[in-house]
Amino acid sequence: MDKYNLIIGSHVSLKANDFFYGSVKEALSYGANTLMVYTGAPQNTRRQPIELFKINEAHNLLKEHNIDLNNLIVHAPYIINPCSSKKYVRELAKEFLIQEIERTQFMGITKIVLHPGSCLDQDEDIALKQVYTMLNEIFATINTNVVVCLETMSGKGSEIGINLKQLKTIIDNVDSKKNIGVCLDTCHMSDSGIALDHDSFNQYLKEFDAQIGIDYIKVLHINDSKNPRGANKDRHENLGYGTIGFDNLINIIYHPLLNNIPKILETPWFDFHDQSISLYEYEIKMIRDRKWFDIKYKLLVGNK
């Protein structure tokens, strides 16, 4: 078996004045070799011109550190709901997602993660059809190499994308197969009811491969969960402090079928001495060492 190629990073900020260049610097400070960004605030449509993003500087810094641009991820804004019951909302979502895909491509990134949406008062089948119809319209409108990665969801409210059947329905009906993929989120999977112990996750991947195809998995979000399995809550926890557990997460991260696939941390920041600090540097070290330690305790007692 080939040596495992661990591609590990986290969500990082993208803000003035350094923009994308600053995002890369932040990722490097955590010891990461990938990253995920939003191209603007995830809760609104306001966006800075992409020309301000210092893209060349970011690309040069990535090259200096031998980081493959193809492993970087953009996350689409939360406000995009492809299966809204309101047509004008779906039209706005489509136009905004087209802009986000084009911004992703301009940055040289090839993957954008998308929440499939919430069907609200609609029938599930109608909602699923609206998602793949929108994606087909988008890929018929623009020529892009960007892959839209449907994120597995927790089942909070009326979210879709919570099981293989729903994901399969969308993917089967997207015409441009090169532009569609899946992002597995471990917190969302557990909160939706999927068991993530060693044997259960092996079985899940077998079922995924049989129903959809393992090659559609393009990225993983690695998060522990504050909730019991099946809670449908979506509350992320730091690695080893939640109900999934560090050993189960390490098994997922280093699973041989998931080699060469980017893994992205979205774990909470830690409230420490009247400030909030990132634990990504420590969590990435734990992942590389495959050994957990109680970083919150060590920070609190002043022993790093």
Curated annotation (Swiss-Prot):
Zn(2+) 1 binds at residues 75, 115, 151. GO terms for biological process: base-excision repair. HAMAP family: Nfo. Its EC number is 3.1.21.2. Its cofactor is Zn(2+). NCBIfam families: nfo (TIGR00587), PRK01060.1-1 (NF002196). Keywords: DNA damage, DNA repair, Endonuclease, Hydrolase, Metal-binding, Nuclease, Zinc. Zn(2+) 3 binds at residues 188, 234, 236. The lineage of its organism: Bacteria, Bacillati, Mycoplasmatota, Mycoplasmoidales, Mycoplasmoidaceae. InterPro entries: AP_endonuc_2, AP_endonuc_F2_Zn_BS, Xyl_isomerase-like_sf, Xyl_isomerase-like_TIM-brl. One of its GO terms (molecular function) is phosphoric diester hydrolase activity. The keyword Coiled coil does not apply. The gene is nfo. Binds 3 Zn(2+) ions. Belongs to the AP endonuclease 2 family. PANTHER family: APURINIC-APYRIMIDINIC ENDONUCLEASE (PTHR21445:SF0), ENDONUCLEASE IV ENDODEOXYRIBONUCLEASE IV (PTHR21445). This is Probable endonuclease 4. Endonuclease IV plays a role in DNA repair. It cleaves phosphodiester bonds at apurinic or apyrimidinic (AP) sites, generating a 3'-hydroxyl group and a 5'-terminal sugar phosphate. It is an enzyme of class 3 (hydrolase). It catalyses: Endonucleolytic cleavage to 5'-phosphooligonucleotide end-products.
